[in-house]
Amino acid sequence: MKLDLKKDHNYQNGIYDFMAGTKSIVVANKEIDIEVDYAWDYASDPVITPTIIHEWKYLDKLVSKNVLKNARSILSIGGGGSSRTHEYLSPVTQEFTILNTGMWDLVNAQIPIETINTYLICATGEDMPILDSQIDAIEIPATLDHVIDARKVIEECYRVLNGGGKIGITLGNSDSWYRKVVSNLRIQVTSNHDHHHNFHFTSKDVENLLSEVGFTEVKTIGTAYLKLPKTIERKMKAPVLLAAHRFISNTMLRLLFGNSKGGMFLTYAMKPTAR
Ligand SMILES: C[S@@+](CC[C@H](N)C(=O)[O-])C[C@H]1O[C@@H](n2cnc3c(N)ncnc32)[C@H](O)[C@@H]1O
């Protein structure tokens, strides 16, 4: 993987910092602040239940199977911190790059085994300091709703991917069946954390974005269909209960509701090979 080292940067403590104090991006004549202070360790957040963590692991497995498999060079945009991608890398992976605007995620990033070259880059997904056609697979884990210019990020992904390379985007779904029920019944929900989201995507929005930029074979897998009261979810720690929860959530209810109505989703696609 070749970095664009002509761009201004510092290299310190194993991190390439290309932000050099950049704090905002201008989109449509509006200056918008970049998220640089994200720092969330879910393990110490009481609202995160065993079932939520189990759902995240399931989504990670889907990314591994549908996006990262057979990729020699992998880029994670918004990874690091509590992300567990290092556990799901393909045996053929030789390079793993984490690009994030936040130093906390980079400093606390879990590094894979040392035979895999790991790059930590502080930069925006909108302007990646990576030369063209360097990467086999990109994951954007729960991050596209945090960026400022989602289309620019997807265009940058297209640029740095090799032909035949894959992209996978995971997100909470603004069009999930239970969010609709909650909003129709006007039930007050206390948010599970105070992260700021610039966008609230549906899987259709992400599919359209990928197609517009030129990606093909765009597919979505919906996940996390089952939501129980927190008091019950907190008690579901036994592996057999979690397995039953996953079966109902991601097999039975997915069959019932279809791929676009889960609480979370993975949308993945391919950059076509040049003809
Ligand atoms: C919900 S977090 C993703 C998961 C996170 N790694 C964790 O462990 O929880 C969203 C991430 O997006 C990063 N981010 C925000 N704006 C970004 C941008 N424009 N380009 C790249 N990363 C960005 C934040 O720093 C944050 O780490």
Name each region found by the language model:
Residues L5-K69, D105, P112, K166-H193:
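Conserved class I S-adenosyl-L-methionine
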Residues L75-D127:
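Class I SAM-dependent methyltransferase SAM/SAH-binding core
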Residues V182-R186, K219-R275:
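A C-terminal cap/extension of S-adenosyl-L-methionine-dependent methyltransferases
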Residues I187-D205:
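Acceptor-substrate binding/catalytic loop of class I
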Residues A142-H146:
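Short catalytic micro-motifs in class I SAM-dependent methyltransferases
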Residues R151-K166:
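A short glycine-rich, Lys/Arg-flanked "PGG" loop and its adjoining helix->strand segment in the class I
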Residues E139:
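A conserved beta-strand element that flanks and buttresses the S-adenosyl-L-methionine
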